[in-house]
């Protein structure tokens, strides 16, 4: 089983399916990656363990980005 540890790993997983995400803001990229993962899983292309692992990585990264925004006073 593939173990995904960071955002780069999730990007590489999506790349295997021809999905490249770059919207210009890291938080937006993470949100779109989560949507794409959902679509791949619903289509039966991802194993549940890999899907959940990737979603957990994205959740962690998204929370980190939100924390940075709060600290900088942005929203």
Task: Give the positions of each predicted feature.
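Amphipathic alpha-helical segments that form the core helices of the histone-fold
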Residues: 30-42
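Amphipathic alpha-helical interaction surfaces
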Residues: 16, 20, 39, 43, ...
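Charged low-complexity stretches with an acidic bias
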Residues: 1-6, 55-75
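Short, charged early-sequence alpha-helical segments and their helix-coil boundaries
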Residues: 43-59
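N-terminal acidic leader/helix
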Residues: 1-27
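Short, conserved alpha-helical segments within structured domains
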Residues: 26-33, 54
